[in-house]
Amino acid sequence: MARAMDNSILETILQQVRPLIGQGKVADYIPALASVDGSKLGIAICTVDGQYYQAGDAQERFSIQSISKVLSLVVAMRHYPEEEIWQRVGKDPSGSPFNSLVQLELEQGIPRNPFINAGALVVCDMLQGRLSAPRQRMLEVVRALSGVSDIAYDVTVARSEFEHSARNAAIAWLMKSFGNFQHDVTTVLQNYFHYCALKMSCAELARTFVFLARQGQAFHLDEPVVTSMQARQINALMATSGMYQNAGEFAWRVGLPAKSGVGGGIVAIVPHEMAIAVWSPELDPAGNSLAGIAVLEQLTQQLGRSVY
């Protein structure tokens, strides 16, 4: 690394970025998220050899939202042959908003990738077909990866999302009309919203996702989470599609595979080195954490890290 890591580096970066708070907007289309304190700012790092660094609000839990789409894909990879997954969802960036219907209509119900809403709903539909208790299975996976036994769903957030689910329901029904959605729409939506409503901290997220920096192997688990090839593929999808329609801008500024959520979290991977989780609830127009991206930009510049 260009500099040796320690908590003081992270604390300095947060101080440098904090003036940006107030320039973004907390997600308000989900009422339960609209009340989150927009001034929160945290970062945590878990290295491939199990060292931890953190600063700011790194221990406070928040709604991970679309970060969960990576986890649902991981579960699907453990239960389906790859060819079955990629027959129903693509591997390309969409270039459109994450909840777009237009592209889905034009491409006959096949979502561009598993990290937009349509793609994640297809993945959840697949899990409904293989798992007897999809919500419980997700909790088991997340608790094992994080090493934290009390991670849970925020039922209030899940309920709030379901009560405002018209667009996601439309996406599911549109895919059903093309034959790319097999199970009860309401049941799958409920599972999807619960996944999005997982509450985790930056520290828990960094530990959960470090397997993607370790070729699919979590350092505290005996069995691989995914194969080394699958870990590489997930990182590639995160690099091209993890930041919604701003994936190119993020690659330019930060240069790491990453996945964001409208709860203000971002998880980024430095392959073979570390997983990074940042949180700042105020979003930019694309739905990504405004200050969170700035923190990652500062960090990668100071550490001299990029996959490009």
Curated annotation (Swiss-Prot):
Classification via Gene3D superfamilies: DD-peptidase/beta-lactamase superfamily
Hydrolase keyword on record: yes
Key words of the record: Hydrolase
Catalytic activity line of the entry: L-glutamine + H2O = L-glutamate + NH4(+)
An example Gene Ontology biological process: glutamine catabolic process
Annotated positions binding substrate: 66, 117, 161, 168, 192, 244, 262
Enzyme superclass (EC): hydrolase
Enzyme Commission identifier(s): 3.5.1.2
GO molecular function, one term: glutaminase activity
InterPro entries named among the record's database cross-references: Beta-lactam/transpept-like, Glutaminase
Oligomeric and partner information: Homotetramer.
Family: Belongs to the glutaminase family.
NCBIfam families, per the entry: Gln_ase (TIGR03814), PRK00971.1-1 (NF002132), PRK00971.1-2 (NF002133)
Protein name: Glutaminase
Organism of this sequence: Citrobacter koseri (strain ATCC BAA-895 / CDC 4225-83 / SGSC4696)
Native organism taxonomy: Bacteria, Pseudomonadati, Pseudomonadota, Gammaproteobacteria, Enterobacterales
Gene name, Swiss-Prot/TrEMBL: glsA
